[in-house]
Amino acid sequence: MAVINPHINFNGNAEEAFTFYRSVLGGEFAKIMRFKDLGSEFPVEEKEAHKIMHIALRIGPNVLIGNDVPESMGRTNENENRSKISVRTESREEADRLFYGLSAGGQIEGPIGDTPWGSYFGCFRDKYGIEWIVEFDPSY
C-alpha cells in the first residue's frame, strides 16, 4: 500500500518549524540535509548554505517532509491555502493537545469542537503559515 507523506516548502525557517513540530507531535528526525552538504553539484549562495535542503520527521508510521526554498528559486507563497495537513488522533485529549500546541502563535480558523458530521474537529494556520486540521473521529 502506498503511503502519503506531506511535504512543506519554507522561506528559510524549515529547521525552526520542524523543531517546533517535533516538540508538539513527537517523533525523531530521520534525515536532515543542508544545502552545503550537496557540494558543488548544487551551488547556492553562502548565506543559504546552512539552510535545509531536506528534512524528514518520522511520526509513527508517517513522515513529515520539508525544505527551505533558496531565494534564487523564488519565494514560497505563504498565503496559499489549497491544502491542509490533516492529523487524525486516537482521543479527544490528544486532539486538544495537538490543536493547542501546534496553533500556539498562529491563527485559529475553526475552534476545536464537536461537528454535525460526528467528529471532534478544529483547523488553524500555524505561526509558520501552514494550515492544519486536527480531528478525532471514533468511526475511523
Give short role names for the model-derived ranges:
Residues K51, P116-S119:
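Short, small/polar residue-rich loop motifs at catalytic or cofactor-binding pockets
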Residues M1-G110, C123-Y140:
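Glyoxalase I/VOC metalloenzyme domain signal
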